[in-house]
Amino acid sequence: QKSVVLAGDSADKLIVSARVAGGTRDRDGLALFLVDAGASGLTRRGYATQDGMRAADLTLSGVRVAPGDVIGEPGKAYPVIERVVDETIAALSAEAVGAMAALHELTVDYLKTRKQFGVPIGSFQVLQHRAVDMFTALEQARSMALYATMMAGEADPTERRRAISAAKVQIGRSARFVGEQAIQLHGGIGMTMEYKAGHYFKRLTMIDLAFGDADHHLRQLAKLGGLIDAAA
């Protein structure tokens, strides 16, 4: 059983991980297999996600693969999976920065045009401060997204994971802050399906949750830095 496989309902080929040896939590013993979407024993249930993307739940029952469908060395797939996840997080971080930048621009434009008491609401200093706070969070996320991109090719897996987790923490926190501020500063229109702000926020929320949210990666960062062991 595989859950929330992104684009899993439209893919022609699926890369499936499966344990071929060892215990449930062992690093060794995982293998990757290339499975045809039409293979006997494979069923897919596709659905739309909250951000308008597509995913699927897969059930594999008695699926057979040929020796040539094994990807890489059997039993040694964990480091490969780990690296692909890190590279994916780096890519998602860049996407999140783009979404946050669009949300910030959209919000600033709205503050300049929406009027209350006969003046643009952007003339109120407290709202200007909130727009600046959004920009600060955006730039923090941008810096960490660049860092994640730089470190995605790092040969040392520990150093790479530390950098990726640090980036994911900041991306998640910034995404939530920028998204919430954008919705609140827009008022009711920010929550409508017809307006772009809510869609950006949904996508940012899904990016935060993908491959571990900010809290998960903060714990990972503490483990990689030895902070949890030291505290224990």
Question: How does the language model describe each region?
Answer:
Residues 59, 64, 78-85, 91:
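Helix-biased detector of long, well-ordered alpha-helical tracts
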Residues 9-12, 26-29, 38, 54-59, ...:
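A generic structural signal for well-ordered coil/turn residues at beta-strand boundaries
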Residues 4-5, 35-65, 73:
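Flexible, small-/acidic-enriched active-site or ligand-binding loops
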